[in-house]
């Protein structure tokens, strides 16, 4: 049974609109990832946005591996925890309530899924008589249990929408679970919660009071992995058809049989490859911060567990095919992005295998110092810096008969958790509070595509703290809402417009510093010059720099096409910034661009500019736009009707930004820099229009200055002459400072060539290496003054004397210390006047140990 499909079809038959899964990177700036089915509808539940439809249903992909909701460390060791999962849900936005929600849930569970009624139990909130009364129409009273706020009351935060909830439980059988926690409401696995119905009927105010909502709503959630396992009659999510093909593939790769009790590593890898494949397919990239860092941790945890299974080379990228095979029927983009995703995973795996080897060296070094208890600090460093899981470290110690200072490790882990908790402040910068609700519904039309000036009315005013006000005094900053606005709000990488607000007579009353979008409201940040009043008739004037912004925005579209044509279809936009004087474009590509590729890309864009291609801007249904081949950004929210910007057959993109009317207006295009952003993501920075002219002028000035510096009109010839002079001088210095190994004082002791001497200049290590090459048995120690200090270096070959011990013995004579390997060691000292004594000490030590 395709439960996902059955669920969506069932609720579609009940007049629910099917919504596709929203991106894993949410619009909500307080969340790291989409972690529940209701996240895409949060603004509707809070009243910040009107509902487009009264009823909705979805199968939402979710991640819980960072921020507040973090299941990462439990994954693999329980039957239910996952980093990636799918949440089935049905939602009512002020339409139906408890009666229908309960009836729908019961009908789906018993008639569509055909779960046996005798296995089902229900819980309600201890105060919810209404819900219990409705449930009694379907189940016996003794199968309905009441619980308190901890189990059966849901709220979004300290304030806001909230309400009691009702949960449906499935009894997996006493024959399988007989532990002390295996009762309804306990922590055991016998009674599994399969569906949570939230009755959003209150709003909690800042005083903590519960106020009835005028239009109560419904939010439900059922985990697909859990209900699939129940329907298939298995006791663990990992034994279901969603995971077993992956576990079988891991078994084939590792040549190890999967046994449930010993199979945590199999389960970790199976779970993590799903999360990694989906996140990469949706445009999240490996990095050292934010979402990219969580992605990196998930992959590396999977690799570490592969290491436990004996997989010592990249393997996870091979499993991405299986993820696409299992889930690509519903999420077609998994197939579309598969080859790029596999490249990205493999590159990250290769990078981590180098780290594992470095970690093993640290482990071996600490092991040599350990008698019974291994350092918790080193174990934490292995975990935190080198990505070693605690169980891997403990397994290696167990083989050596050693124990770990686990208490110290846990202390450091707790400190890290506290730091991470304090550091996580969300990922966006929009206002999370304020009087925006007061402005919703007011007319706010963007007219900036057609004109840069507009006669309009200030319909709303907020101060800098986003609180409603009637006016702004001179010098005061605040946000204005205009009935018609020519100011473009920051979006799609294009910065927000600046400009002026004038009275009709022409008097300037405010500077527009920026324009942003809050909850679909185009609002401009202003600084008042004169008093700015609500409901005042004004003229809004966009700064002339907008024309330069438009040039750079159009150039990014053409650049995107150039990259896909020259580098390959795997290139997708990962981010952009469009300003008046520059552009920045991030794109997926596994390696740096060479000079030839950069030149080809630059030439392509300039050829399109020279062709003078007319820009065609048209609004059309999104399906038609996709048929035309319009490129859309994964994760961007598009309506049923979209704006398409075309430059002939060169570029077709969905875009709400401002553009030139003809490619010739861009003028010229120069790439100023190509660099890496993170693993698999490159960045191009470029200029066009007047910025390109200014750049060319600055280059010309630099060339003139360079010509003067090298005293040659032909700069390249002048540089070549300077390089030749430097080369000759370096050779002279080398000739002066080199010391012949034959000139050094040496003697033979017990058949071993012993060299102990002071050298004035030269590379000590090279001299020692030359001596080693010349002798089968050698002990050498050299001293060299370096200002007020002294450097000692020693080498040994074919003898029992150890250079590290020799240096440790002699260094204190010159007031220093050091050490190293048996074959080479170094030390430093602060008393160069005692080199003579040190040479004698070195000779005595050599006689004693040779």
Curated annotation (Swiss-Prot):
**What cofactors are annotated for this protein?**
Zn(2+)
In the record, what terms sit under GO molecular function?
alanine-tRNA ligase activity; aminoacyl-tRNA deacylase activity; ATP binding; tRNA binding; zinc ion binding
Keyword Protein biosynthesis assigned: yes
Q: Which InterPro entries match?
A: aa-tRNA-synth_II/BPL/LPL, Ala-tRNA-lgiase_IIc, Ala-tRNA-ligase_IIc_anticod-bd, Ala-tRNA-synth_IIc_core, Ala-tRNA-synth_IIc_N, Ala-tRNA_ligase, Ala_tRNA_ligase_euk/bac, DHHA1_dom
Where Zn(2+) binds, per the record, is at 553, 557, 655, 659
Gene Ontology BP term (one)? alanyl-tRNA aminoacylation
HAMAP family (UniProt xref): Ala_tRNA_synth_B (MF_00036_B)
Protein's name according to its UniProt entry: Alanine--tRNA ligase
The gene that this protein is the product of is alaS
């Amino acid at each position: 049974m395709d439960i996902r499909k059955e669920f969506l079809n069932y609720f579609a038959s009940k007049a629910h609109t099917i919504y596709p899964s929203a991106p894993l990177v949410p619009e909500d700036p307080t969340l790291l990832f989409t972690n529940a089915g209701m996240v895409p509808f949060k603004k509707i539940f809070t009243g910040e946005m009107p509902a487009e439809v009264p009823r909705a249903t979805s199968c939402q992909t979710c991640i819980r591996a960072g921020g507040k909701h973090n299941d990462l460390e439990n994954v693999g060791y329980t039957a239910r925890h996952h980093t990636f999962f799918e949440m089935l849900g049905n939602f009512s936005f002020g339409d139906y309530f408890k009666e229908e929600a309960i009836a729908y849930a019961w009908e789906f569970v018993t008639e569509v899924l055909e779960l046996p009624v005798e296995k089902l139990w229900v819980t309600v909130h201890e105060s919810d008589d209404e819900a219990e009364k409705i449930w009694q129409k379907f189940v016996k009273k003794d199968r309905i249990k009441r619980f308190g706020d901890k189990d059966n009351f849901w709220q979004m935060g300290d304030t806001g929408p909230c309400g009691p909830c009702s949960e449906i439980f499935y009894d997996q059988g006493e024959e399988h679970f007989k532990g002390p926690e295996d009762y309804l409401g306990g922590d055991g696995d016998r009674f599994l919660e399969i569906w949570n119905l939230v009755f959003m009927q209150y709003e909690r105010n800042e005083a903590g009071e519960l106020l009835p909502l005028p239009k109560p709503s419904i939010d439900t959630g059922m985990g697909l992995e859990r209900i699939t396992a129940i329907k298939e009659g298995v006791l663990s999510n990992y034994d279901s058809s969603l995971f077993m093909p992956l576990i079988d593939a891991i078994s084939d790769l590792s040549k190890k049989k999967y046994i449930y009790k010993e199979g945590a590593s199999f389960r970790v890898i199976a779970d993590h490859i799903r999360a990694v494949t989906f996140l990469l397919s949706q445009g999240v990239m490996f990095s050292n911060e934010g979402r990219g860092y969580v992605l990196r941790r998930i992959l590396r945890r999977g690799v570490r567990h592969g290491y436990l299974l004996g997989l010592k080379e990249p393997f996870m990228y091979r499993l991405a095919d299986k993820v696409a095979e299992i889930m690509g029927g519903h999420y077609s983009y998994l197939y579309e992005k598969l080859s790029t995703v596999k490249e990205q995973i493999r590159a990250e795996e290769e990078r981590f295998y180098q780290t594992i080897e470095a970690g093993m060296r640290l482990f071996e070094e600490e092991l040599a110092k350990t008698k019974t208890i291994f350092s918790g600090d080193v174990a934490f460093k292995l975990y935190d810096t080198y990505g070693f899981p605690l169980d891997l470290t403990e397994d290696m110690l167990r083989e050596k008969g050693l124990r770990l200072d686990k208490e110290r490790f846990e202390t450091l882990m707790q400190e890290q958790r506290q730091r991470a908790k304090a550091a996580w402040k969300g990922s966006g910068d929009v206002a999370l509070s304020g009087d925006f609700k007061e402005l919703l519904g007011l007319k706010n039309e963007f007219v900036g595509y057609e004109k840069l000036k507009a006669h309009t009315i200030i319909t709303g005013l907020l101060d800098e703290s986003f609180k409603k006000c009637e006016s702004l005094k001179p010098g005061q900053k605040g946000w204005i809402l205009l009935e018609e606005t020519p100011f473009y709000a920051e979006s799609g990488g294009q910065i927000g417009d600046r400009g002026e607000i004038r009275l009709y007579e022409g008097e300037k009353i405010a500077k527009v510093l920026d324009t942003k979008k809050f909850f679909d409201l185009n609002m401009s940040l202003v600084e008042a010059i004169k008093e700015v009043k609500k409901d005042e008739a004004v003229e809004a004037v966009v700064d002339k720099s907008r024309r330069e912004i438009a040039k750079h925005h159009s150039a990014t579209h053409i650049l995107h096409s150039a990259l896909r044509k020259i580098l390959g279809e795997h290139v997708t936009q990962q981010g952009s910034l469009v300003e008046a004087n520059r552009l920045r474009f991030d794109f997926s590509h596994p390696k740096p661009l060479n000079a030839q590729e950069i030149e080809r890309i630059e030439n392509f864009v300039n050829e399109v500019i020279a062709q003078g291609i007319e820009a065609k801007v048209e609004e059309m249904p999104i399906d038609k736009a996709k048929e035309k081949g319009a490129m859309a950004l994964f994760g961007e929210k598009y309506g049923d009707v979209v704006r398409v910007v075309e430059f002939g057959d060169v570029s077709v993109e969905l875009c709400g930004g401002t553009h030139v009317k003809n490619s010739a207006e861009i003028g010229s295009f120069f790439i100023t820099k190509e660099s890496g952003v993170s693993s698999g993501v490159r960045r191009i920075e470029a200029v066009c229009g007047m910025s390109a002219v200014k750049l060319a002028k600055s280059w010309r000035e630099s060339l003139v200055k360079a010509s003067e510096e090298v005293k040659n009109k032909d700069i390249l010839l002048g540089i070549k002459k300077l390089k030749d002079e430097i080369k000759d001088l370096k050779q002279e210095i080398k000739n002066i400072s080199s010391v012949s190994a034959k000139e050094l004082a040496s003697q033979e002791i017990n058949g071993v060539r012993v060299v102990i001497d002071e050298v004035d200049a030269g590379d000590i290590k090279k001299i020692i290496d030359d001596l080693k090459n010349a002798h089968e048995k050698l002990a050498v120690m050299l001293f060299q003054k370096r200002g007020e200090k002294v450097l000692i270096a020693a080498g040994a070959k074919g003898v029992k004397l150890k250079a590290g011990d020799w240096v440790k013995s002699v260094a204190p004579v010159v007031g220093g210390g050091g050490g190293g390997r048996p074959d080479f060691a170094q030390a430093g000292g602060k008393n160069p006047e005692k080199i003579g004594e040190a040479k004698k000490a070195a000779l005595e030590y050599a006689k004693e140990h040779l």
